[in-house]
Amino acid sequence: MNMSLLQTPSLLMYNKMLKSLADGKSFTKVLALFGELRGQGLYPDNFTLPVVLKSIGRLRKVIEGEKVHGYAVKAGLEFDSYVSNSLMGMYASLGKIEITHKVFDEMPQRDVVSWNGLISSYVGNGRFEDAIGVFKRMSQESNLKFDEGTIVSTLSACSALKNLEIGERIYRFVVTEFEMSVRIGNALVDMFCKCGCLDKARAVFDSMRDKNVKCWTSMVFGYVSTGRIDEARVLFERSPVKDVVLWTAMMNGYVQFNRFDEALELFRCMQTAGIRPDNFVLVSLLTGCAQTGALEQGKWIHGYINENRVTVDKVVGTALVDMYAKCGCIETALEVFYEIKERDTASWTSLIYGLAMNGMSGRALDLYYEMENVGVRLDAITFVAVLTACNHGGFVAEGRKIFHSMTERHNVQPKSEHCSCLIDLLCRAGLLDEAEELIDKMRGESDETLVPVYCSLLSAARNYGNVKIAERVAEKLEKVEVSDSSAHTLLASVYASANRWEDVTNVRRKMKDLGIRKFPGCSSIEIDGVGHEFIVGDDLLSHPKMDEINSMLHQTTNLMLDLEHKEIDS
């Protein structure tokens, strides 16, 4: 019997079984069967290897991938376009993008799949400039015509980079030489939205005969990202199919632009429609509660999470911690924090900041040291939180030590916000010379960054009667063109304290010339789940509960006067 005649059908049978397993995503079984094939003394061919290489990529088995690549070289299969393209796909899945490009460069012949594979590999690894570079190279070096894969992958890179030039070039190609598929239409809408060309995105959207929910979501997101919330809602209502991503995009828009009541109303509509919210929806709503101080609504969402047995992962848990902390319920925030099974950097940082903002700086520092001890990675935001705690608690020595530990122990480079925290801490403690020295080291920063720290030092100089520093800072501020009214107002106050009225007039005139106006102070409060906002100088007569407000003010004033009289009498 001729054995060579038996090997072909046996290999064919193995190839069919391997493909069936790969189609069913049983990638581990693919590798096991491949090992069995090799044990039988069979030689994999250009149909076997692509299936195996795909499975290796999905399982991220680097060593196995290198072995199969070595076999392909020995067997003379590496230059087969099907095998080469599969090698590129495997290395891209393994994150080895340089080897992916090397395989591409060594191919004697490249088809459109090869070019698309390299472009999508760069896109998948976040190297969007390189993806655009490959697209340009394909245009110049190859006579191959772009296909849907080329267009969609390159448009993804354009979206990420906001590269309108290449995006419009592809759009013109599609209009003149290609048919507008749903995938291409989605990619064009997304690209134009990300580049801020809403009208062009809408034109493409309206021209599409068939649209899926992804296309509707991209267009809604485009309107939301530019603040055109009402137009987004109209389009949202028109969408024939609404998945959880579309609902989330619309709700995020309301939260982002402080229209929280409408976000909650939409959430209730979502429940009525029978759409189960995912964690992204809940995090968005909890963020809105935190931003507006809507404690009752936050508690209601927490109740919904418990009643529906939603898994409180580290993202949802952190959002709950943040919401309770910002609403002043710090003990509840602590309870939620310690219930989170896998706490990450964001979880710890959120609670540290919450403790600091609720006047518990000592506990915030304790938590910071606990975070260090358990080995959680500290990032730049963590240090802003802990330095804020030092600032609020007046812990000068701890603040200095932690600031210096950023580079010495944690390999985190201090940024302007960290310096600002330490400068403010030093100013509050009256260590003005040290604060000024630190500001001098920030001279490379922008005016918008320097003005707040100058203001801190100027305010401290005024409070501590340090005229020399006040005048030095005033000189620096006079040279800065800023739109922040507080800097100019504070400078005028310093001059007024020194009876330099002509300088006060000059500052006021400069504010007028620059069109800078001092915005009135504002305070807000939530009562029975309803938010109320009060602005200095505002006409309160229009408030529906003005009589009750006045009555309470009179009662409070009388109570304070009574207490004052009792203290005087005693």
Swiss-Prot record:
Q: Which domain of life is it from?
A: Eukaryota
State the PPR repeat positions.
10-44, 45-79, 80-110, 111-141, 147-177, 181-215, 216-242, 243-277, 278-312, 313-343, 344-378, 379-414, 415-449
Keyword Repeat included in the entry's annotation: yes
Enumerate the Gene3D superfamilies for this protein. Answer: Tetratricopeptide repeat domain
Query: Region Type E(+) motif: what ranges?
Result: 529-561
Signal peptide positions are none
InterPro entries xrefs: E_motif, Pentatricopeptide_rpt, PPR_At4g14850-like_plant, TPR-like_helical_dom_sf
Task: Give an example GO molecular function.
Answer: RNA binding
One Pfam family of this chain: PPR_1
**What are the UniProt keywords, alphabetically?**
Repeat
A GO BP term here is:
RNA modification
Quick check: keyword Zinc-finger in the entry?
no
Q: Where is this region: Type E motif?
A: 453-528
Residues crossing the lipid bilayer are: none
- Please give the family membership noted in the entry: Belongs to the PPR family. PCMP-E subfamily.
What the entry lists under NCBIfam families is as follows: PPR
Name of the protein: Pentatricopeptide repeat-containing protein At1g31430
